[in-house]
Structures are given as structure tokens and as C-alpha cells.
């Protein structure tokens, strides 16, 4: 086992990043399809497609919250487990895995109960109109029953990737996505279930992915295994995981809060078509964010392991390469969106009016996308080295300090209030990336100097 896991500290960084990031990026790209394939099919339901798409879009904030809770323990626990592996403390690494697993189950039970009891009320508060509430409620009610699958799949898959098994993590997503793509048209169109069919397809697909994850983590191929004796929550091990995971949780949960604010403002100033366009914009933004996060997740085991092993040279080298790759991707996608916005809109709907509206605002909404490579590289590296405070600062700054106030401030200052709501995103992005880069330049250097002094 010792010989197997040390490849994170010995193989060339460029080769390692390709080995770990490519499967993770593929998984994120497929996961992106997993997340948006429902919307593509729903948007093409005869006669009611546009309203149904808008209704499912209102569910997005709640779905983001469910996903965020999966990150609450795992996004902190997985890097901590990698750091323990770098220190050759496999016992603490496995206890971290077991404690996070148990905590994830408890969170799932609570979330399922909340969604079933108060889901409809939440949808109305989150921007559903009388025209879209029935579609939203139908989708969410069925989706709620798959909460356990979502939590364990997203949460525990992070521990698979953290051990360096990027391909296994990729298969987790491929299995679910393939099942979802096959089941969606059957349930939505062939069986005439509409949005309920889309939700059922998602739940069943997540169940398959969950089974795959648990079989691997209980098997002999994993370095870190789920063992009965480790399924207890040790505050000493879990609290640092939760503190570190709080940054990722804040980032994802804030997406939900921001989505609610966007939907409410857009419904007020632009009506259902503006909310429908926002559903498409959010999906397009996933084309940017998920692959970037995949690259960052591929780099995470390398950074965390070598940080734990006090190999600062490889930590620096990994960050430089991560930043370069992330920037190339974000700039390339930004150019495509700015040049061909209508192409992205047509993927989701055949409605000519919605396509025209979306194409116009997409250029505005994604204007700051080219800078995302810097944001993600710095953010993911903070998490990888266990810098909980800096991670939380970066997460809170962009969404709560900048974007949230701008959603309400800009419409009060500009004549075209609907456009002003969309403009809040790029303005916040530019300011946030600037602040993040400055913070990272000082804190990353300080963390490595401290590590070298204690070596």
C-alpha cells in the first residue's frame, strides 16, 4: 500500500495532473450533461416546454443546496484524508472517511424530510409563479426521495479521487449520466410522465452511481476503505473537515441564495421569459465552472499529499500548472460564448423569442468569464492546503459581499433594469478575482514558508 500511494509524491507533476485531471474533467463534463439533460428534454416537451423549463429552473436553488451539503463534509474531508496519507497516517485517513460517511447519512435524512414537508412553500419563495409552480413541485417531490443517493455519490466520490483513483471517480459519473440520458426520454416522452419522469430518471441514475461508489470504497482496491469500526463521528477529526468544507459549502449554497435573488428580481422586472433565460444562463455557466472544478479536483490530491509531505517545490509547481490550464480553458470558452451566444441558447429550447432574449443577455452575464481560471485555481489550492479561513473569505466575498448587493443596486441605477440584473454577475466577477489574486499571492507564500521552516 505504501508503495502504491507514493506516486503522488514522485511522478512528474505534469504527467500526474494529466493522469488525474483528464478523467476528473471528463467526469465533470458528463456531470454537466447529467445536470442539464433534464432541462434539454423538458424544454422540448410539446406545448408546455418553456413553462416546464422555467419551473424546473426554480428547483435549481434547492438542488444546489442538496449538492452543497454533500460538499460540507467531503470537500473538507477528502483533502484532509490526502494530507494524512502524505504524513503516512492511514488510520486517521480512514477514520476521516468513516466519520464523513456517517455524517453524510444524517444530513441526507434531515434534507429529505425538509424537502417533502416544505418543498412547495420553498419553491414559491424562490420565484415560482402561478404558471410554473405545478411543474416545479412535481419535479422536486420525486427528486427529494433521491437525496440520500445524491449526498453519498457526491460526498464519497471525492474520497475516491483524493486517493488518486481519478478513473474510478470518472466512472461514478459516467454510470449515472448514461443511465439518465437513456431513461429521460423513456419516462418523459414514451411514458408521458413529463417533468416527473425527468426527476425519476435522475433519482434512479443517482442510485446506480451511489452503489458503484460504495462497492469500491468497501472493496480491496481502495487505499482508504469504509470499515464498520470507523463509522463514528470523532470531533477531533471531523471538525477540521467541516471547517475546511465550509468554504465549498458556502460557495455552493450561495449559488442557491444568488439563484433565488436572480429569479425574484428577474421575475419582477422581466417576467417568466427572463427567469427562463436565467435557467439557460446557469446551465451555460456550468460549461465553465464544472470543467474548471474538475481540473482543480485533479490537482487536489497532488497538492494535498505533497503539502502533507512538506514537499513545497511540488506544491508550487502544481499550482503554476493548474493556473495555466485553468486560464486557457476559461479564456477559450469566453471567446466562444461571446462570438456564438445563440448557439448555446438553441441547445435548450426551440422557442425563438426565448433564444433571442437569451443570446442577448448571455454576452452580458458571461463577460467576466475569462478571469474564472484565476479564481478557481486560487480557490481550489486554498482548500487543498487546508487553509480554511482564506477559503471561506474567497467564497463569501464574491457571492455575498459583491454579487448579492449588486443584484439589487444596479437595477436602481440603470434604466434597463432587467439587463442591470444580469450585469451584476460580471461586475462582481472582476472585483472578486482581483481581491482573490491579491490574497492568494500573500497567503500562499506565507503558508509555504511556514511549512519549509518546520521541515
Identify what each model region corresponds to.
Residues 42-64, 131-135, 195-196, 237-244, ...:
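Interfacial/gating helices of multi-pass transporter permease domains
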Residues 36-40, 113, 121, 155-159, ...:
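Alpha-helical transmembrane segments of multipass membrane proteins
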Residues 8-48, 61-76, 80, 84, ...:
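N-terminal transmembrane alpha-helices
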Residues 53-113, 150-169, 277-335, 339-341, ...:
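Small-residue-rich hydrophobic transmembrane alpha-helices
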Residues 19-38, 142, 176, 205-209, ...:
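Transmembrane helical elements of multi-pass membrane transporters/channels
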Residues 74, 143-161, 169-177, 198-213, ...:
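Short runs within selected transmembrane alpha-helices of multi-pass transporters and secretion channels
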Residues 1-24, 81-148, 190-245, 303-368, ...:
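Short alpha-helical transmembrane segments in multi-pass integral membrane proteins
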Amino acid at each position: 500500500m505504501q508503495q502504491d500511494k507514493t506516486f503522488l509524491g514522485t511522478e512528474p507533476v505534469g504527467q500526474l495532473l494529466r493522469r488525474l485531471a483528464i478523467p476528473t474533467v471528463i467526469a465533470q463534463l458528463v456531470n454537466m450533461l447529467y445536470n442539464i439533460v433534464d432541462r434539454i428534454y423538458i424544454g422540448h416537451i410539446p406545448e408546455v416546454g418553456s413553462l416546464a423549463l422555467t419551473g424546473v429552473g426554480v428547483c435549481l436553488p434547492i438542488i444546489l443546496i442538496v449538492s452543497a451539503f454533500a460538499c460540507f463534509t467531503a470537500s473538507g474531508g477528502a483533502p484532509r484524508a490526502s494530507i494524512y496519507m502524505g504524513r503516512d497516517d492511514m488510520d486517521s485517513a480512514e477514520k476521516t472517511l468513516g466519520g464523513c460517511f456517517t455524517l453524510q447519512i444524517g444530513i441526507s435524512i434531515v434534507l429529505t424530510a425538509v424537502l417533502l414537508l416544505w418543498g412547495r412553500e420553498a419553491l414559491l419563495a424562490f420565484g415560482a409563479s402561478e404558471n410554473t409552480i405545478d411543474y416545479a413541485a412535481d419535479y422536486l417531490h420525486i427528486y427529494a426521495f433521491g437525496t440520500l443517493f445524491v449526498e453519498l455519490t457526491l460526498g464519497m466520490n471525492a474520497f475516491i479521487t483524493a486517493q488518486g483513483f481519478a478513473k474510478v471517480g470518472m466512472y461514478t459519473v459516467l454510470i449515472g449520466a448514461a443511465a439518465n440520458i437513456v431513461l429521460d426520454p423513456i419516462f418523459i416522452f414514451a411514458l408521458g410522465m413529463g417533468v416527473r419522469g425527468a426527476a425519476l430518471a435522475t433519482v434512479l441514475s443517482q442510485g446506480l452511481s451511489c452503489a458503484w461508489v460504495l462497492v469500491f470504497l468497501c472493496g480491496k482496491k481502495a487505499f482508504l476503505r469504509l470499515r464498520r469500526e470507523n463509522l463514528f463521528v470523532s470531533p477531533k477529526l471531523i471538525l477540521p473537515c467541516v471547517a475546511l468544507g465550509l468554504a465549498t459549502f458556502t460557495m455552493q449554497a450561495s449559488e442557491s441564495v444568488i439563484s433565488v435573488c436572480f429569479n425574484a428580481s428577474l421575475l419582477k422586472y422581466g417576467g417568466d421569459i427572463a427567469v427562463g433565460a436565467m435557467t439557460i444562463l446557469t446551465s451555460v455557466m456550468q460549461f465553465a465552472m464544472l470543467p474548471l472544478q474538475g481540473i482543480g479536483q485533479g490537482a487536489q490530491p497532488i497538492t494535498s499529499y505533497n503539502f502533507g509531505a512538506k514537499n513545497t517545490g511540488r506544491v508550487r509547481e502544481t499550482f503554476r500548472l493548474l493556473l495555466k490550464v485553468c486560464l486557457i480553458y476559461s479564456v477559450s470558452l469566453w471567446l466562444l460564448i461571446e462570438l456564438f451566444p445563440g448557439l448555446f441558447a438553441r441547445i435548450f429550447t426551440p422557442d425563438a423569442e426565448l433564444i433571442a432574449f437569451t443570446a442577448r443577455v448571455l454576452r452580458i452575464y458571461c463577460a467576466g468569464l475569462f478571469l474564472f481560471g484565476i479564481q478557481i485555481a486560487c480557490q481550489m489550492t486554498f482548500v487543498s492546503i487546508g487553509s480554511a479561513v482564506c477559503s471561506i473569505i474567497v467564497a463569501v466575498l464574491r457571492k455575498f459581499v459583491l454579487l448579492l448587493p449588486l443584484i439589487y443596486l444596479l437595477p436602481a441605477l440603470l434604466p434597463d433594469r432587467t439587463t442591470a440584473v444580469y450585469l451584476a454577475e460580471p461586475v462582481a466577477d472582476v472585483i472578486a478575482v482581483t481581491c482573490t489574486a491579491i490574497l492568494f499571492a500573500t497567503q500562499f507564500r506565507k503558508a509555504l514558508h511556514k511549512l519549509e521552516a518546520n521541515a
